[in-house]
């Protein structure tokens, strides 16, 4: 599990990756783990200030968490943790 005591801000639940995100990561020659670690530590990536503030609120109120990252080849990816913390999913924006 990637939840690291003292670093992870929340329980990620089960990790899931969509076929599109898995293919995009493979095409970019990258792995999801660094992005998942960033998400779990509160580094929300390429989110605007308003969405980062929404995540801060969501942490305190057990709401959905969103991160957005750009892979080395320019592909946009999202990571979403469900409000009930049952699952964290790596996906492409068009798979939402």
Describe the residue ranges of each PLM region.
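Compact soluble domain cores
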Residues: 2-66
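Short, compact, well-ordered microdomains
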Residues: 59-96
